[in-house]
Amino acid sequence: MVELKTFLLYAVTALAEIAGCYLPWLWLRQDRSAWLLVPGAACLALFAWLLTLHPAAAGRVYAAYGGVYVAVALGWLWAVDGIRPDRWDLAGAAVTLAGMAIIAFAPRGAA
């Protein structure tokens, strides 16, 4: 159950980061309201706070988080951008998630 909680925390963290970057992107690239910067900043603050909730060392958290970020970003590609990930996207996500699992759940202290 710890693994599921860890993965879900990484996924929520990734959503906060992606939303925090996407909202300024809308303002800069699609001429949307500058008011989008306010929730964008809030999302990035939430992202930073969520990273502190992970119990591992910061560098290990960032490394493992990267794998989940890739998978969540592909979900965003499909849900928000309307582009369905292809088999290569999915293969890449599987590799990064495998790396995340090794980093996050390896038995530390074992030889």
From Swiss-Prot:
<keyword id="KW-0812">Transmembrane</keyword>
<feature type="transmembrane region" description="Helical">
    <location>
        <begin position="33"/>
        <end position="53"/>
    </location>
</feature>
<keyword id="KW-1003">Cell membrane</keyword>
<keyword id="KW-1133">Transmembrane helix</keyword>
<comment type="similarity">
    <text>Belongs to the UPF0060 family.</text>
</comment>
<keyword id="KW-0997">Cell inner membrane</keyword>
<dbReference type="InterPro" id="IPR003844">
    <property type="entry name" value="UPF0060"/>
</dbReference>
<feature type="transmembrane region" description="Helical">
    <location>
        <begin position="90"/>
        <end position="110"/>
    </location>
</feature>
<feature type="transmembrane region" description="Helical">
    <location>
        <begin position="63"/>
        <end position="83"/>
    </location>
</feature>
<keyword id="KW-0472">Membrane</keyword>
<protein>
    <recommendedName>
        <fullName>UPF0060 membrane protein Aave_2845</fullName>
    </recommendedName>
</protein>
<dbReference type="Pfam" id="PF02694">
    <property type="entry name" value="UPF0060"/>
</dbReference>
<dbReference type="GO" id="GO:0005886">
    <property type="term" value="C:plasma membrane"/>
</dbReference>
<feature type="transmembrane region" description="Helical">
    <location>
        <begin position="7"/>
        <end position="27"/>
    </location>
</feature>
